[in-house]
Regions:
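Active-site hotspot residues in diverse enzymes, especially metal/ion-binding acidic/histidine motifs
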Residues: 1-293
Length: 293
């Protein structure tokens, strides 16, 4: 297994790292795990891209060696629904016992991914897969923040299995790969980093970019292989072309519509021609293409 390392960290060991560096790390991990996830077929002058798809359960269990458990994760904070959790050390987690209609604590072992029943049973499959990879991101990127050594029955920082320092409980509102704006705390940055890792694992730029460009070339009104951004149904042809490409891509990669839109922006594949950020989008596209060119 490829181990993550980072030369720059904050005081609490949160990595200080750019998104492109996380993308490079994710690409290295994919090469080590299943290199075919970074390949596509090509036929003559009209390439036909069919990237292989990552199985988050297989990656978490067989590559990271993590356990995956599903519970009704309980939180006392009103309106704060938990999608999943990454457990680094032995941790007591409060769950809801539907059989007895009460809450109880369970002791969760290290290197465990918890999924809430709502995440698995009622949400889009893409959200479930993204949540698993988000938690894998925490387990791979943030060991130095949370991991404690157990020596003769005691952690090096104290025997505290009920401490919140042993696990990351991730709110549903934080899952999905939001763009890098409004980040102020180290926790914010760690959530962003986990989202970035998940997005780059499920939609690797090496295959995602050519696949999307193939879909875009079906419409001759996209300029310079940049999609016209249309987030509101204004009845224009650009809006429906945008929706079609995003939906096709989401279905193929097994992710949500929202997750695709985030990666399109991150990789520089979408911009509004009336916006000055077109140049920035083109710079991003070249940057992520440099991962394999």
């Amino acid at each position: 297994m490829i181990e993550f390392s980072c030369n720059r960290t904050s005081e609490d060991m949160t990595p200080v790292i750019r998104d492109i560096e996380i993308a490079k790390f994710a690409q290295t991990v994919l090469y080590d795990y299943r290199p075919e996830l970074l390949t596509y077929t090509s036929y003559g002058d009209d390439p036909y891209y069919e990237p292989a798809l990552l199985d988050p359960y297989d990656f978490a269990q067989n590559y990271l060696g993590s356990n995956i458990e599903v519970h009704d994760i309980y939180t006392e904070t009103k309106g704060e629904l938990i999608a999943g959790a990454a457990v680094f050390n032995y941790q007591k987690v409060k769950v809801f016992d539907k059989d007895n209609m009460c809450t109880r604590e369970i002791l969760v072992p290290p290197n465990t991914i918890l999924l809430d029943n709502e995440t698995v049973d009622h949400w889009h499959k893409g959200f479930e897969f993204f949540t698993i990879m988000h938690e894998c991101g925490h387990l791979m990127l943030h060991q130095r923040v949370y991991r404690r050594e157990l020596v003769q029955g005691f952690y090096t920082t104290g025997n505290v299995p009920d401490s919140s320092e042993n696990a990351v409980l991730c709110k549903r509102s934080n899952i999905g790969g939001t763009r890098r704006t409004g980040l102020s705390t180290n926790e914010d940055f760690r959530e962003h980093q986990a989202n970035t890792f998940a997005g780059c694992m499920l939609m690797p730029p090496r295959v995602f970019i050519p696949y999307v460009q193939k879909q875009m070339r079906k419409y001759d009104r996209f300029e310079d292989e940049l999609m016209v951004t249309r987030t509101i149904n204004d009845g224009s042809g650009e809006y429906w072309r945008y929706v079609d490409v995003v939906n096709r891509t989401a279905r193929h990669f097994g992710v949500s519509y929202k997750a695709v839109r985030v990666q399109l922006a991150k990789y520089g594949l979408q911009a509004d021609p009336k916006d000055e950020r077109v140049k920035e989008a083109k710079r991003r596209l070249k940057l992520y293409q440099s991962l394999w060119k």
